A protein has these predicted regions:
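Conserved class I S-adenosyl-L-methionine
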Residues: 1-39, 147
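A short, conserved alpha-helix within the catalytic core of class I
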Residues: 116-129
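Conserved beta-strand signature within the Rossmann-like core of class I S-adenosyl-L-methionine
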Residues: 136-143
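Short alpha-helix
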Residues: 160-180
């Protein structure tokens, strides 16, 4: 059985611990690229945001952040992290299919390790993320590549959920690719993303 077939139950079980399983610190790739390409006051959507580490960091930079996740426990922990950090984030309980994807809504969409999606769902999700960006809006994404199956230091063990350069180029066709990097790096993001990792990072800008 695919562990993602009941996503809410799967993620509620994973998040059912006092610890922040991916840590409280924002993803390194996001911090680097947001500093370069996002401005204070930008409207940002964080997709499948989990326990809030990325949305809270963006709010600390002065951005207006909406974030959703399908796990009630993740939302509760994210709200607490925002409260502890003295920032405001608009958290909503939703899946990637039930979220209200309004067109031309955001200056940026942030998608960090959203590899719960099989190829069919992934194509649908990327189309929605691009649609909800304003013209000249920026998509910042990080995920694992197939080599991650050798490292086993985080992410799904399902090959078709992982990213390649070619897959991502096809999915963001029509956008201007600012950065598309495939690389290896030691991660230290809580207990679930720890050790040498095979990564892909993307920054792309909507043209229309």
């Amino acid at each position: 059985m695919d562990v993602f077939s009941d996503g809410a139950e799967f993620w509620n079980q994973r998040f059912n611990t006092p610890d922040y399983i991916f840590g409280r610190t924002a993803n390194d790739y996001l911090r680097e690229k947001a500093t370069l390409y996002l401005a204070e006051g930008s409207t940002v959507l964080c997709v499948a945001d989990g326990e809030g580490r990325n949305s809270v960091w963006l709010a600390k930079q002065g951005m207006q952040v909406d974030a959703f996740d399908l796990s009630t426990l993740a939302i509760t922990k994210a709200k607490q992290l925002a409260l502890d950090s003295e920032v405001q984030v608009n958290y909503l309980l939703a899946s990637s299919d039930s979220w209200d994807w309004r067109p031309n809504q955001y200056d940026a969409v942030v998608a960090i390790f959203i590899q719960f999606a099989d190829p069919t769902m992934r194509a649908r999700l990327f189309a929605k993320m691009m649609s909800t960006l304003k013209p000249r809006g920026v998509l910042i994404l990080q995920g694992y590549t197939p080599k991650q199956l050798e490292y086993k230091t985080g992410g799904p063990s399902i090959l078709e959920h992982l990213y390649t350069d070619g897959i991502i180029r096809d999915l963001v066709g029509g956008m201007d690719i600012i950065d598309l990097s495939v690389y290896e790096k030691v991660l230290s993001e809580g207990s679930k993303h720890t050790g040498m990792s095979a990564l892909l990072g993307l920054v792309a800008r909507k043209t229309l």
